[in-house]
């Protein structure tokens, strides 16, 4: 079986373990930096190139960093269109990184969670803050992971200032009530 591991670096522990295990089991295996892949999107003939040569695999194992979800998922989708099986589908990669979608589904299912607001226009910030509750507020970048892009604001004014600052760079943000029992854990 021809196996492609889509990763930024073979030196990453998980990538090197996958590579060694696949080789040990007799698979023709290659680690490919998905950021260095480029695609040719044409009628009925999707193609992917890496370092100047066309590549194709029977199976791909995506190791896509959160920062590169959009591009990484596009590369995986192109392999899927070429007939490769993927350990994680392009759709599942995209969905798993969509915090807003996950929160909407969790909230709709009745699971306890912090009250969360989402707003597009700056003029509606104060209104959405009131729907979330009273300060403190947790302000989160939708694209942030592992605690990056999270701000705790103690007052409504501080929350408005933080949100307006994030909005200046067209960031999508979530506003959540602060749950004191969480001890600062997300």
Located regions from the model:
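ATP-binding N-terminal substructure of ATP-dependent carboxylate-amine bond-forming enzymes
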Residues: 1-87, 101
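Short catalytic-loop micro-motif centered on adjacent basic/acidic residues
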Residues: 4-6, 61-62, 88, 114-116, ...
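Short, structured patches in soluble enzyme cores that scaffold and shape functional sites
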Residues: 7, 118-120, 140-143, 154-155, ...
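A conserved helix-loop-beta module that forms one wall/lid of the active-site cleft
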Residues: 27-34, 76-149
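Solvent-exposed alpha-helices and their adjacent loops that cap or buttress functional pockets
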Residues: 52-54, 130-132, 142-145, 166-167, ...
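Short glycine-rich, flexible loops that bind phosphorylated cofactors or substrates
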Residues: 68-70, 146, 182
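Phosphate-binding site of ATP-dependent enzymes
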Residues: 150-186
């Amino acid at each position: 079986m021809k196996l492609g591991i889509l990763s930024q670096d073979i030196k990453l522990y998980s990538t090197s373990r996958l590579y060694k295990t696949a080789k040990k089991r007799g698979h023709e295996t290659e680690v490919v930096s998905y950021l260095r892949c480029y695609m040719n999107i044409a009628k009925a003939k999707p193609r992917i190139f890496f370092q100047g040569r066309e590549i194709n695999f029977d199976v791909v194992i995506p190791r896509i960093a959160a920062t590169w979800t959009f591009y990484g998922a596009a590369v995986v989708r192109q392999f899927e269109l070429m007939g490769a099986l993927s350990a994680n589908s392009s759709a599942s990669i995209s969905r798993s990184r969509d915090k807003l979608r996950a929160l909407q589904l969790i909230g709709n299912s009745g699971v306890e969670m912090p009250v969360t607001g989402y707003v597009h226009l700056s003029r509606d910030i104060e209104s959405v803050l009131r729907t979330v509750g009273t300060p403190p507020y947790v302000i989160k970048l939708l694209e942030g992971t592992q605690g990056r892009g999270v701000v705790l604001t103690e007052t409504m004014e501080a929350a408005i200032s933080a949100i307006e600052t994030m909005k200046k760079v067209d960031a999508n943000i979530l506003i959540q009530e602060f749950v004191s029992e969480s001890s600062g854990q997300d």
